[in-house]
Amino acid sequence: MSHGKMPLVLSLVLILCGLFNSISCEKQQTSPKTITPVSFKRIAALSQKMEANYKAFAQELFKTLLIEDPRKNMIFSPVSISISLATLSLGLRSATRTNAIDVLERDLRNLRVWDKHQALQHLVEMLHELEKKKQLKHKDIFFIDRNKKMNQMFLKEIDRVYKVDIQMIDFKDKEKTKKAINQFVADKIDKKAKNLITHLDPQTLLCLVNYVFFKGILERAFQTNLTKKEDFFVNEKTIVQVDMMRKTERMIYSRSEELLATMVKMPCKENASIILVLPDTGKFDFALKEMAAKRARLQKTNELQIGALSCAQDQDHLQDRFKHLLPKIGINDIFTTKAVTWNTTRTSTILEAVHHAVIEVKEDGLTKNAAKDKDFWKVPVDKKEVPVVVKFDRPFFLFVEDEITRRDLFVAKVFNPKTE
């Protein structure tokens, strides 16, 4: 592979999509209250509880996805999904809205629903800061039937509070609608996101697309001249050929006998890190069950170690239905006919949404700051210490972490780099 090409792109399309049976232009009996974006000073008082709630939600989502299909590649952004669910809840009322938002902020149930939306602004602001640094791209897009009129307050609120892009589109011809949505996403966001929408219900009048893209530039590059084809051991019966990247340097390393796994942390520019966790041979299923609970301890015990790192690179484009998973983490009504929206004339409403997450990591992206301390990370010629060999040639986990907040921006499970 030539110098400068991406070594790893993992993408997952998690199907979630908004279907409304009947959208009315009539005045609603219950209008939503205006939400004032919360300031950092107001966030401070609730920050500790919000952080615990966010981590609990991300952990439940992680465990649910693992149990659902442990032998499948997976990638999702808990931050982005949290924002999308909060956005959808703005279109709900009564118990349905309370159920959706309470799952995100479990310990803040005594607060008004609108105060909870203000509390969630810390996630929105964090993504906006990353976008300013051109490290991350995040967008929620509502495609709405131009032949129907929606409650204008709803549109104003989702735009103002969660910065949602609203696109009016003709839903009469579903095939043309699918093509139009897919073309818009490909042209405006990501050309690799082809055929994002594969099915639209005949009654669909609204479709939500949630997109999040991370472009990680490693501070210390892989040695591109050492990349070559090698075996990746999916299991005892399945072996696939992948491009294996290599580098030897001082690295952030951790070993857990409790989790039976090894961790390597690779800093990226602009306060983000790629964290790779490699379960021991034959211990992948054990790590699946214990990862959510024991990973934090693994990261706390890290140290600088001279290591010889080998990591598989490839591209995966995955698709999975998501709405049957949400009830398992406590969101029971949002995708059923029990959902009540203040945008409809009937109580029968079905909701779905599309979450498209992409990670791109360049193997050669040495930044200026990293160049200054490259002598610190490189292995001295006269060093007698034997490097620890860490070879990601079997199923592993990948996390993208924000170094300032310690939140997971992305969570990924690479089971087979050659399958979708």
Curated annotation (Swiss-Prot):
PROSITE patterns: SERPIN. It comes from the Eukaryota. Belongs to the serpin family. UTMP subfamily. Keywords: Glycoprotein, Pregnancy, Protease inhibitor, Secreted, Serine protease inhibitor, Signal. Glycans are attached at N225, N271, N343. The record marks V381, D382 as: Reactive bond. Gene3D superfamilies: Alpha-1-antitrypsin, domain 1, Antithrombin, subunit I, domain 2. This is Uteroferrin-associated basic protein 2. PANTHER family: SERINE PROTEASE INHIBITOR, SERPIN, UTEROFERRIN-ASSOCIATED PROTEIN. InterPro entries: Serpin_CS (IPR023795), Serpin_dom (IPR023796), Serpin_fam (IPR000215), Serpin_sf (IPR036186), Serpin_sf_1 (IPR042178), Serpin_sf_2 (IPR042185). One of its GO terms (biological process) is female pregnancy. GO terms for cellular component: extracellular space. Residues 1-25 form the signal peptide. It is found in: Secreted, Extracellular space. One of its GO terms (molecular function) is serine-type endopeptidase inhibitor activity. SMART domains: SERPIN.
